[in-house]
Amino acid sequence: MRKKPELLIPASSLEVLKIAVVFGADAVYIGGEAFGLRAKAKNFSMEDMREGIAFAHEHGVKVYVTANILAHNKDLPQAREYFQELKEIKPDALIISDPGIYMIAQEICPEIERHISTQANNTNYGTYLFWWNQGAKRVVSARELSLEEIREIRSHIPEEMEIETFIHGAMCISYSGRCLLSNFFTGRDANQGACTHPCRWKYSVVEETRPGEYMPVYENERGTYIFNSKDLCMIGHMEDILSSGIDSLKIEGRMKTALYVATVARTYRKAIDDCLEDPEKYRKNMPWYQEQIRSCTYRQFTTGFFYGKPDETSQIYDNNTYEKGYTYLGIVWEVEDGVCRIEQRNKFSLGETIEIMKPDGRNQEVTVERIVNEEGKDQESAPHPQQILYVTLSQAPEKYDILRRKEN
């Protein structure tokens, strides 16, 4: 096996970046306020990016910045300004899909590594070699590749070149995410970061000789969702993943909550480390990994293209809803004399049993004993989103612990 692969975790905001770092990421990928493909994510201002990169580097974690839109002419002057700013704050790499954007990055900040986004349709070793010859350090493989194809790519490219591969998260119905459904239905360009996810909508069928007659396609009483993929999950196949020559194991989810990011980062961190230490230990701990992964929001799971082309079992035809095991209550930002300061994310109440989720894998059940607002007034509950609260629990948490509540 090559060197220990990197665990690469998404972050939608500065607070989520800090959680990703603390809960086990080797590297974090983020988007700025321009040129990423997640316009609906909070994204990072330059100041947040600067702070996030400093925090990550203090903990020995790398930060990659996405600049992976498919650019139009109007984007190129702004790209030059953007890369000048990034040059000063020194991220560890830029993730790029567009050759025009790539050339600008290469000109302005050649000292920053350039990684080629999955949006560039990287499906063969010839493509990898092309980008290597252009100076790219790493290529993100298309989700449409099997493990066998990835191994073949590894055998044809330079030893120093890196392969990054998605191993967990949402799957796009379109080839390497290059979808036009959002453009067609809403005028919002998925390749400019504004996807409205029409693949998750409910559809009917029209027969061409009966225009205007919309016939529902039923899988159950709620209709059918013919483009709706299950989520990718390779937690049960780490032995195959770790022997395939992949250098970076990437988690999708740059619009996910801190709870989701913490759960997935912590679980894959332990699975990777256990598998490398002792495959038998990894197999023995499989029920714990599966339980933890299913504790955050997901859409049912598939192994995607890793073992061949997906069939109908990789789709969800009867609903577009997430499964949900826990509700996210907040992050512990400070603890003093047993009282923790949090920013509330969902309602909780006095006397309620909740869980403290810790980076080391432990989960502690605790009781909410007191809730005090910033004015020093006691509250019976915490109903207001993003309210700053001072909470006393039956056991004191630690900084960066996450509070959550198990759902039935």
Write out the residue ranges for each language-model feature.
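Surface-exposed amphipathic alpha-helical tracts and adjacent flexible/coil segments at the periphery
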Residues: 1-11, 16-22, 27-34, 52-53, ...
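Glycine-rich, positively charged N-terminal anion/phosphate-binding segment
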Residues: 38-55
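Short beta-strand elements of ligand-binding domains
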Residues: 65-66, 96, 116-118
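Conserved phosphotransfer cores of two-component systems
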Residues: 109
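Alpha-helix capping/helix-boundary segments
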Residues: 100-101
